[in-house]
Each structure stands twice: as structure tokens, then as C-alpha cells.
């Protein structure tokens, strides 16, 4: 009856909203995905209860000044083209409160035009999330669990809500890949229009995604080429991670790169050290090895100086600096991205330029990776390559550790690397070939 309804309204919904927005102000007013969930919950509760003050707190922050709250989060957590600063894994995660609350705002207060706010940033963010994937799986840089894909609750909701707003037939292509939609009016529209054959291929493309609220804190470069795979996207993708740190979930991997080809991750990123929701593995939380290995520079395809991680492994320091994106071109025939950073190590400037040329008569993809480090002092430079596959051959003499298994170092990730074999290169040159899924890959290096 009415008494029960009032009791639930007052003792469940209002009490929870009060706890989140007035007793937990430090979390509620953060510019962070934790606050996005809190503001979305309070705002949607406000709409349910007809409480305009609650909605205002959610949109504008606990003091309703606009310096915090949901609207401010859309302005500071995404770059102008919809890249979320923590990376694709958390972009997927945060899209749920962003889009579900935005959908509620649109239903209750269409005059706010939330989907037009900041030049349509939330719809850009949804499309950018899809662009940051290969065969449906997100590029696993920063803290990322590698088996998260477009087939997740956040993206079922997000694709349906975005389609309801835009009627973009490319989103139907993604919904078809997902194989399901959600029980809401926009979900019914997705199913109906898919059945009517209105889907068009999603435009996977080479693109430069700026980082930072003003787009001036580095970038993520995505270079795509080759004939389309089963998912309708180019078969070869190179990612250059020239972005900002991405707060606490960021890794120390400035100017790192990854490569996908032939349906597989070839030059790989470890992602996060975590068994999500597995109670026996530290309650499903991040493992200690996330700090000691997964975040370390040597765990990535980046230049490591003096066996230490970028910024000394200090996330607060790293948040203050980012690479400078020097050049980007998606011109057919020669795609290129170039960036530099002089703050990852004191007194060391690093520039990296990956190129993807298309050469007549060469069927397989080719990547040229130019790395230059300069310093007034002598340093040890290590350039790891983490790849997927089985080693076939190499053109240098190795000294194999068959009786014992030493480790490479004592700290900064090096303590986790076993030395299987070592070699001295002839004139700084060498080549190594491995096989993955019926295709050979050769890495040639010269210094």
C-alpha cells in the first residue's frame, strides 16, 4: 500500500541517495568513474521520486556549483573525440552509468539535450569504444582484463541507447555481432531494424584519438590496413600508446605499441594481473603482481632506461606529464604516427615513429619501428618485444640456461623475467622469426 511505498521511498531510496551525495561527498564529487556510478544512481533516484533537488545534486555536484557532478564528468573524463582517459577497459565499464543516466535525463528532461552536450560527447564515446577493439575484444592496455569484449552488459545497453538516439545503421552491425539486445524501447527498435536488414558495416578506421579534456595530453594512434576480416574490419591494426597516464589504472608504458594481424594479437600487451570475481585469487581484486609486473615498463613494448619504470613507477608524478604527438597520417600507402617524451626519465628524450607502408608485390603487412633516445649521460637502454607464438629461428648464437633459471633483475618488473637464453649481437643486428596461427612473423632489429 501507500505506507509501504512511502517507507521504501524514505528508508531505502532517500537514505541511499543521502549517503552517496551528502555523507560521501569526497567520492561523489570526484572526477572519476566511481563518482559517475554514484551520480547516476542518485540522479535516477531523483527522477523516480520526483525530487528535483536530488537530480540537481547529481548533475552539478553536491553543492550544485557545476564544478563536480555528472555534467562535469562528461567534460573532464573524455577527450573531445570521446577517448576516456583510463583506457578502453574502463571506458567500457564507465559507459553504463554515463549512457543509462543520460537516457533517463533525455526521457525526463529532454530540454537539457544531454546527448547534444559538449558536441555529442557521450555518443562519440560509444563509437570510440567500438573503434578501440579488434574482432570484438578491447585493446588491453592499462589495467584491462583481456577477455572483455563488445559482448558485455555495458555495450548491450550502450549500443541500444545510442541507436535509439541516432538510428545509425552501423550500430546495428555491432548489435548483430553482439547477438542480443536489451529489454527497452530502443532495444526493441534495434531488433526490429536488424530484422528489416538495415545494418551497415561499422566504419573501423585509422584514427588519432586525443587524450585529456582539451585534447592536448597526448593521444592513442590506431593504424588499420588490409582486407576485411570476418568482423568487417581491416585485418592488420597497429596501436601506438602515446597517451596520458590515465590515473591509477594507467601503466608505465609511454610510446608503447601493439600489433594485431590475421585475427590474432601479435605484439601483445599483458593487461592486468587480476582474476575478476575469483574469490581464491585475493578476492577477485587486483593482485600484487599488478604493481610489481603488469604496470612496469619492462612488461610493455616500450623503451626502458636503467632497468627502471617510467616516472620511477610513481603514478601521481606520471599524471602530470604526457607525450607530444608530433605527426599522424592515415594516408593510403604510408600510414605513420610519431611522438616523443622527455619527462619519463630525467635527462632522457625518447622519440618513436612506427610506420605501416603498403609495398607493391608484398602481400604480408610490414611495420617499421624507429626509436631514438638521446641523453647527455650514459644509460642502459632495453627495448622489449612481447609477442604471441612459437619461436622458429634466429640468426644469432645463444647461450642457453639449461641447468638453472636466473632472473633478469631485482626490481621494477625485471624480477619476474626468467633468462631462458642470451646472445651477443653481431654489429647490433639480428632477426627472430616466430609462428602463430599458420603465419610466420620476423622481427629484424638494428642499433
Give names to the regions the model predicted.
Residues 172-404, 408:
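Catalytic and substrate-binding regions of extracellular carbohydrate-active enzymes
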Residues 1-130:
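Aromatic-lined, polymer-binding surfaces characteristic
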Residues 51-54, 104-112, 135, 228-231, ...:
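Secondary-structure transition/capping motifs at alpha-helix termini
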Residues 113-191:
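C-terminal, helix-dominated tail/subdomain
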Residues 13-22, 127-133, 293-306, 371-380, ...:
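A short, hydrophobic secondary-structure junction motif
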Residues 378, 386-447:
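Polysaccharide-binding surfaces and accessory modules of carbohydrate-active proteins
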Amino acid at each position: 500500500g501507500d505506507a509501504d511505498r512511502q517507507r521504501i521511498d524514505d528508508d531505502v531510496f532517500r537514505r541511499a541517495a543521502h549517503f552517496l551525495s551528502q555523507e560521501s561527498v569526497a567520492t561523489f564529487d570526484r572526477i572519476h568513474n566511481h563518482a559517475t556510478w554514484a551520480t547516476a544512481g542518485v540522479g535516477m533516484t531523483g527522477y523516480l521520486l520526483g525530487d528535483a533537488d536530488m537530480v540537481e545534486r547529481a548533475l552539478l555536484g553536491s553543492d550544485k556549483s557545476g564544478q563536480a557532478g555528472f555534467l562535469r564528468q562528461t567534460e573532464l573524463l573524455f577527450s573531445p573525440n570521446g577517448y576516456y582517459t583510463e583506457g578502453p577497459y574502463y571506458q567500457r565499464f564507465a559507459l553504463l552509468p554515463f549512457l543509462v543516466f543520460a537516457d533517463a535525463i533525455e526521457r525526463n528532461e529532454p530540454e537539457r539535450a544531454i546527448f547534444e552536450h559538449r558536441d555529442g560527447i557521450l555518443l562519440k564515446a560509444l563509437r570510440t569504444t567500438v573503434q578501440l577493439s579488434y574482432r570484438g575484444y578491447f585493446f588491453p592496455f592499462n589495467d584491462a582484463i583481456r577477455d572483455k569484449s563488445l559482448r558485455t552488459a555495458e555495450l548491450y545497453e550502450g549500443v541500444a541507447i545510442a541507436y535509439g538516439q541516432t538510428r545509425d545503421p552501423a550500430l546495428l552491425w555491432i548489435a548483430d555481432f553482439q547477438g542480443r539486445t536489451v529489454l527497452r524501447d530502443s532495444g526493441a527498435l534495434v531488433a526490429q531494424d536488424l530484422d528489416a536488414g538495415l545494418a551497415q558495416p561499422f566504419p573501423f578506421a585509422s584514427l588519432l584519438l586525443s587524450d585529456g579534456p582539451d585534447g592536448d595530453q597526448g593521444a592513442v594512434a590506431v593504424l588499420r590496413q588490409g582486407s576485411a576480416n570476418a568482423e568487417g574490419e581491416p585485418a592488420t591494426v597497429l596501436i601506438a600508446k602515446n597517451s596520458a597516464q590515465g590515473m591509477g589504472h594507467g601503466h608505465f608504458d609511454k610510446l608503447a605499441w601493439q600489433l594485431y594481424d590475421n585475427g590474432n594479437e601479435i605484439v601483445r600487451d599483458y593487461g592486468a594481473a587480476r582474476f575478476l570475481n575469483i574469490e581464491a585469487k585475493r578476492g577477485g581484486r587486483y593482485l600484487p603482481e599488478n604493481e610489481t609486473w603488469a604496470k612496469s615498463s619492462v612488461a610493455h613494448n616500450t623503451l626502458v632506461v636503467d632497468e627502471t619504470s617510467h616516472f620511477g613507477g610513481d603514478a601521481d608524478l606520471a599524471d602530470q606529464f604526457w607525450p607530444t604527438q608530433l605527426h599522424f597520417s592515415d594516408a593510403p600507402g604510408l600510414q605513420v604516427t610519431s611522438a616523443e617524451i622527455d619527462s619519463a626519465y630525467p635527462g632522457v628524450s625518447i622519440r618513436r615513429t612506427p610506420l605501416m607502408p603498403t609495398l607493391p608485390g608484398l602481400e604480408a603487412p610490414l611495420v617499421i619501428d624507429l626509436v631514438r633516445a638521446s641523453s647527455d649521460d650514459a644509460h642502459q637502454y632495453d627495448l622489449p618485444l612481447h609477442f604471441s607464438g612459437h619461436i622458429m629461428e634466429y640468426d644469432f648464437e645463444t647461450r642457453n640456461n639449461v641447468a638453472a633459471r636466473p632472473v633478469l633483475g631485482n626490481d621494477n618488473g625485471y624480477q619476474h623475467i626468467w633468462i631462458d637464453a642470451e646472445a651477443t649481437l653481431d654489429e647490433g643486428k639480428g632477426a627472430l622469426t616466430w609462428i602463430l596461427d599458420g603465419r610466420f612473423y620476423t622481427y629484424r632489429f638494428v642499433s
